[in-house]
């Protein structure tokens, strides 16, 4: 006990020492953070590192890798366009590199392609390779192709991004995104007495559940995959398809799927039914998800009438006396008028359909708000004018032509359509087409004042299978990638949409910046009135109060000018920070690409050492000083209550005092008179 008592400090000294130690620890934690910190799922940057003009890194610990998706550069993401960027080669071994942080992908792909002999075209994923887990749309394609090579590579030299692994080849049955690997060079941490805690290794999941969104699957069938001319079919169900021959978005495919299933334009036999789209049908429908460099508004087309028409029937009999039928149909437009408008970014996720019997509304079960996808595909075919659906939440009118009879009437009137055990597999097939008029509906819009009836709600029939699947985060079995949106990855570098600074209400409360300049005549009048007895001091007060109003107006104007200047400086600081950040990222990417030749400086020499200086702290200090001097200080009361009483209020205390003295003298005289 005696030994322990020797180590104890007095209470007051212990408090001072502990307070000093805590201050040092907090200061160390606040100011010793490196440039980039990979925590959980977001690459957060706390300071900008100075550009190092060297042909090699001082330490590999300074290098952090980030996976960036190609769709952020505006490449086409639909299946027909994406497959043209992939090709097969032989004799080149695959390469796999790891990365630590990445973006959320808008479009991912999943391929299962077979050769004509039934063998697999793509290799299975090696151990440890998991699918890219953060995809809004997964385009799952199956089919056949020649596959002239051992592996499928990217023709542009990009990577195929998986879960924290980037490979040069495509693996079978695994979700992947197209992208590149960029490298950030972080500041080397300083060695101090009290070291900050080590950076936590990036976890393979995202703790922030609010950043989740559902993953939707779209299924395709591809013929002649990997060749110059291939055919891509969007799968509605096992026997109903849509030929994709033009730019399209996932939102368009969702709406087309809902429309076909609502009107039961499905194959009711074992044969295939392939719908084609007219040349002028607008398949570029929907909004971009989060890429700010892409369009955020799209045309809205209202009042369309769609028609489903059977074109041809092909029958081929095989050795087993069974026939394989492929029926082709065309989706065309019979609208007489077209209206274009701009759609807000947050449109409701549903497709409204007008039919002659009344308004019906079909919820789009697999679409979410704010979807945006890049599009680009092959050449267009067919010949009739058409325009498909508007964007989410828009109305369209649908009518069908072709047979002129319902399916029940066709079956009852045509003996060839009557099913029998002997002829069921060889009968001529006509798709089931409901009869609707082609006249324009006169039903007022649902939200218009003239609408008197409530629109019934129709849902997709339960017995209809759909190729559009939605997987929610809690149902997913794969672990997450250290991913985030574009604003999450480089947010603190200046790329995130920051909320605007709240303007101090005290600075703009009742502040009037309008100045009143006193003229020479007003000054002479005030000076002349000042010589009048008993009235002069009041006139001087009026003149002085006018000067004070002018002074307050000057202060108010300066405060507003300081506020606007501060906002302009903040925008300028953000722009320069973004530009400097992009410069550093591009420089590091160039150094990585030229590393085999010694780096950029080895090639350019001294010209490469152009350092983009970081003046962030200097500008921030000036902004804070302006805010402290002009904006955060409270304003005096600026009530505009000028009246005849203004200017005389300062004489009230003096008048009260004089009146009190006079009353005291009178009272004293009265007392003396009474006593005498």
From Swiss-Prot:
This is Envelope glycoprotein. SUPFAM superfamilies: Virus ectodomain. Residues 524-539 are annotated as: Fusion peptide. It comes from Sudan ebolavirus (strain Boniface-76) (SEBOV). A lipid is attached at residues 670, 672 (S-palmitoyl cysteine). The record marks 57, 63, 88, 170 as: Involved in receptor recognition and/or post-binding events. Residues 1-32 form the signal peptide. The mucin-like region seems to be involved in the cytotoxic function. This region is also involved in binding to human CLEC10A. Belongs to the filoviruses glycoprotein family.
